[in-house]
């Protein structure tokens, strides 16, 4: 269960970094610095990819844990909250990167 908690923390970290880079992308694009904007865009996409992989690994860990015993209510709640944050934040970053 500690592994799952750590995965959840890393997902949040990756999404926060993706958000930061997406904001810098918009800022640089607005200032006409397309070279730097392009780099921030790529960095944001990389962070989104990392978050997606971690999300996938966490879902797999939860599935494996479910075969042995039911996760605690607290862990299930943390995962449900993390999943909702992941969906919301990843969608926000993707929208920013489409600008």
Q: Positions of the model-derived regions?
A:
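Non-heme di-metal
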Residues: 1-99
């Amino acid at each position: 269960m500690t592994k799952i908690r750590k995965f959840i923390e890393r997902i949040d970290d990756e999404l926060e970094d993706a958000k930061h880079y997406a904001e810098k992308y918009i800022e640089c694009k607005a200032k006409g610095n397309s070279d730097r904007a392009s780099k921030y865009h790529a960095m944001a996409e990389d962070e989104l990819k990392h978050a997606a992989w971690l999300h996938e690994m966490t879902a797999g860990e939860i599935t494996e844990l479910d075969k042995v015993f039911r996760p605690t209510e607290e862990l299930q709640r943390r995962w449900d909250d993390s999943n909702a944050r992941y969906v919301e934040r990843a969608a926000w970053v993707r929208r920013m990167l489409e600008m």
